[in-house]
A protein has these predicted regions:
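Ribosome-associated RNA-binding proteins
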Residues: 1-159
């Protein structure tokens, strides 16, 4: 079986929504995308409003009959970003296949998987740079830390 050609996207200082929508489009077109530095992507807006929004989602929405049933909200930066991409894909088989073509890592690619992405071609998402913002922003790492994520030193977990 032929190895897919991977596209490498560095999410550091990128606006999360703009980046995720472009990644979703590329994945639907059949591109294989690996995203690194997910924790450094930014969400535009005032820090206290953004943190309050995500903490409210995390703590207040529960199933009254069985709180363990969900909905489940991700507090790890890689799964948080992957979930946002999933929300931008169609809810059918085509969207599920597109999501399989997207790999997200918290920081850099782990040494074990570097050979898989050795020939990855770097790509740039237009109009998604943080410099475009004239207002305040908060990183995904800050949001996830506020939602309860504690980074394990020495281990880079990813999907």
């Amino acid at each position: 079986m032929q190895q897919p050609e991977w596209k490498l996207l560095d999410a550091a200082d990128m606006i999360m929504g703009r980046m995720c929508s472009q990644v979703a489009k590329l994945a639907l077109l059949g591109e294989h995308i690996v995203i690194i530095n997910a924790k450094d992507a930014v969400i535009s807006g005032r820090r206290n409003q953004i943190l309050a929004k995500y903490v409210h989602l995390r703590r207040d929405i529960r199933n009254l009959s069985n709180p363990r049933r969900g909905p489940f909200h991700n507090s790890r930066p890689d799964t948080f970003l992957r979930q946002k991409i999933r929300f931008m894909l169609p809810k059918n088989h085509r969207g599920a296949e597109a999501l399989k073509r997207v790999h997200v890592y918290i920081a850099d690619i782990p040494d074990v998987k570097k050979s898989k992405y050795a020939n990855a071609e770097p790509i740039i998402v237009r109009n998604a740079s943080k410099e475009r913002l004239s207002r305040k922003s908060v990183t995904i790492e800050d949001v996830c830390n506020n939602m309860g994520w504690t980074r394990k030193r020495g281990k880079e977990l990813s999907i």
